[in-house]
């Protein structure tokens, strides 16, 4: 985060490795959850239906029960992790929690925010659906998550194989995410590649990597694989890859 702040201030910041100072007996690690969207296909299969802001201002999950009622509780990672940290506050370093990554094709956080839900055709078939309210509620929850210590990230718009699709599809997907999702979460500089499909091989990114440069142009600085290990970290002058 300091990178962009210093850059806007006219400085010339660079990424560099530093020692991680932790209390004795503690281990640094990155926790992430991708696809925090509660897709339509998950309805009725025992998953939470969406994340809402609870009465205490903290994010919590809703779940549709078999009888049609709505139950509010710890039905997914976010509220479960929050409860654990309340009992074990030393688990979290300076309030840091998990990285949550979103696609966009079905919306985010259980809210139907994709552009397709705002079309006249969809509205005609769902007259009680309020597209603008869905987006407003998603943005409210996203802010609550950030206030609660979570980092928000991209998981591509269409859950695409970002290392294999054509450059044309790559640009289209990235632009859709930038248009439909980024404004709801306040932007991000983190991307978690779907399927662990990176945009290069194991060697460091090169300046002539067209996909790398395009993602950087959209503000991304942290490039992560969902199946990475703690030993795989590459730090460039203006980005980190893990």
Regions found by a protein language model. Name each.
Residues 1-144, 148, 199:
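Active-site beta->alpha N-cap acidic-glycine motif
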Residues 1, 6, 11-32, 38-43, ...:
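C-terminal active-site subregion of NodB/CE4 polysaccharide deacetylases
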Residues 99-101, 153, 224:
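Structural detector of well-ordered beta-strand residues that form the stable sheet scaffold
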Residues 142, 146-160:
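Aromatic- and acid-rich polysaccharide-binding/catalytic face
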Residues 132-135, 139, 156, 164-167, ...:
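Alpha-helix initiation and capping sites
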Residues 104, 158, 194-197:
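Residue-level signal for short, function-critical loop segments
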């Amino acid at each position: 985060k300091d990178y962009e702040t210093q850059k806007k201030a006219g400085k010339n910041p660079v990424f560099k490795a530093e020692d991680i100072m932790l209390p004795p007996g503690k281990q640094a690690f990155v926790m992430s959850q991708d696809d925090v969207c509660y897709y339509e296909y998950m309805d009725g299969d025992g998953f939470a239906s969406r994340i809402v802001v609870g009465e205490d201002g903290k994010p919590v999950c809703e779940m549709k029960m078999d009888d049609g009622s709505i139950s509010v509780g710890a039905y997914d990672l976010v509220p479960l992790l929050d409860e654990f940290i309340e009992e074990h506050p030393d688990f979290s370093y300076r309030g840091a929690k998990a990285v949550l990554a979103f696609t966009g094709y079905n919306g985010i956080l259980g809210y139907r925010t994709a552009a397709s839900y705002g079309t006249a055709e969809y509205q005609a078939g769902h007259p009680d659906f309020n597209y603008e309210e869905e987006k407003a509620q998603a943005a409210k929850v996203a802010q609550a998550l950030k206030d609660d210590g979570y980092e928000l990230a991209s998981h591509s718009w269409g859950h695409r194989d970002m290392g294999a699709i054509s450059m044309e599809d790559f640009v289209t997907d990235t632009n859709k995410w930038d248009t439909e999702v980024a404004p709801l979460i306040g932007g991000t500089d983190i991307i978690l590649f779907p399927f662990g499909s990176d945009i290069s091989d194991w060697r460091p990114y090169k300046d002539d990597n067209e996909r790398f440069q395009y993602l950087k142009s959209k503000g991304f600085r942290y490039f992560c694989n969902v199946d990475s290990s703690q030993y795989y970290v590459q730090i460039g002058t203006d980005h980190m890859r893990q």
